[in-house]
């Protein structure tokens, strides 16, 4: 098995009751929006870590839920972000538009951003 590299996104949304429900909600978003699926999970009394990947890349996205974090994380100015290359850019754009998760489009550059349930911007490139 390849050694996969992980990206970390920490989720602390207080809007969902129960960490299990929250984990399902975030995993569902990333699966539907970016075709990432869960490859492994670590669950303790204090946190849940879920690793997402696809069958194309050797990268993993790490989602972490901290039980006792009292408020949403400060996302800064969103200058740091992840970019995902779409195999079918037009189909991806249509799907994201239907999902209502497009938060910014730059037609001149031929890119757009979607926003995850925590407010992280994810760039979509052709």
What annotation goes with each model-predicted range?
Residues 1-9, 15-16, 40, 51, ...:
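Vicinal oxygen chelate
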Residues 55-59, 68-70, 88-90:
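Short, charged/polar surface micro-motifs in flexible loops or helix N-caps
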């Amino acid at each position: 098995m390849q050694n996969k590299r992980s990206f970390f996104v920490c989720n602390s949304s207080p809007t969902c009751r129960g960490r299990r429900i929250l984990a399902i909600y975030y995993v569902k978003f990333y699966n539907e929006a970016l075709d990432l699926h869960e490859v492994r999970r670590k669950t303790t009394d204090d946190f849940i870590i879920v690793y997402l990947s696809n069958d194309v890349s050797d990268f993993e996205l790490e989602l972490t839920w901290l039980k006792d974090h009292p408020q949403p994380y400060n996302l800064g100015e969103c200058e740091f972000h992840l970019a995902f290359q779409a195999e079918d850019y037009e189909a991806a754009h249509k799907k994201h538009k239907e999902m209502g998760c497009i938060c910014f489009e730059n037609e001149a550059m031929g890119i757009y951003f979607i926003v995850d349930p925590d407010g992280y911007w994810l760039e979509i490139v052709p």
